[in-house]
Design a protein with these regions (language model features):
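Acetyl-CoA-dependent GNAT
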Residues: 5-73, 77-81, 96-101, 131-132
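Conserved beta-strand-loop-alpha-helix junction that forms the acyl-donor binding cleft
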Residues: 107-118, 134-137
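Conserved acetyl-CoA pyrophosphate-binding loop and the N-cap/start of the following alpha-helix
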Residues: 80, 84-93
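Conserved active-site tyrosine of GNAT-family acetyltransferases
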Residues: 121, 126
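Extreme N-terminal starter segment of soluble prokaryotic enzymes
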Residues: 1-2
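Conserved beta-strand segments that form the floor/walls of ligand-binding pockets within enzyme
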Residues: 71, 75, 107-109, 139
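Terminal substrate-recognition subdomain of acyl/acetyltransferases
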Residues: 137-144
Length: 144
């Protein structure tokens, strides 16, 4: 898998992704901020596509570099979730961020109920460092 600048076509495709219950919360249309991110090229500064060896879109990363840290937002194409691709997908994004920004740490937030994602992030070396006030989200980090 490789990470590359996102095209308008890829951003439009991601905006159309629909996840099955209970993951529909991750549909782009479920959050106006995500709609704006994918619809507005000016907002895509750190948004990148992840493609496979056949140039098929696998997912995306939204990188937010801040000092010695890179915050991550990411998503995988719905039909590819649960198929054992999480580790190479996450590794591709982390490798890209290391080359681009040389961070000391990576940080992300995940819905507390999303056990599948929590397992994947733990396997990728992330550990819990906090929870949001409402405890809906788990904050995770790992060293770069």
């Amino acid at each position: 898998m490789r990470v590359e600048p996102i095209t308008d076509e890829q951003a439009a495709a991601i905006a159309e992704w629909r996840y099955e219950f209970p993951y529909e919360w991750y549909d782009t249309s479920a959050d106006p901020r995500r709609v704006e991110l994918f619809a507005n090229p000016a907002r895509r500064t750190h948004l990148r596509a992840v493609v496979d060896d056949g140039d098929e879109l696998v997912g995306f990363f939204n990188f937010v570099p801040e000092g010695h840290e890179v915050r991550l937002g990411l998503g995988m194409r719905p039909d590819l979730t649960g198929r054992g691709l999480a580790q190479p997908f996450i590794a591709a994004g982390l490798d890209y961020a290391r080359r681009e920004w040389r961070p000391r740490t990576f940080r992300l937030w995940v819905a507390r109920w999303n056990e599948r994602a929590l397992r994947a992030y733990r396997r990728a070396g992330f550990h819990e460092v906090g929870r949001s006030e409402e405890s809906r989200f788990v904050e995770m980090e790992r060293s770069a």
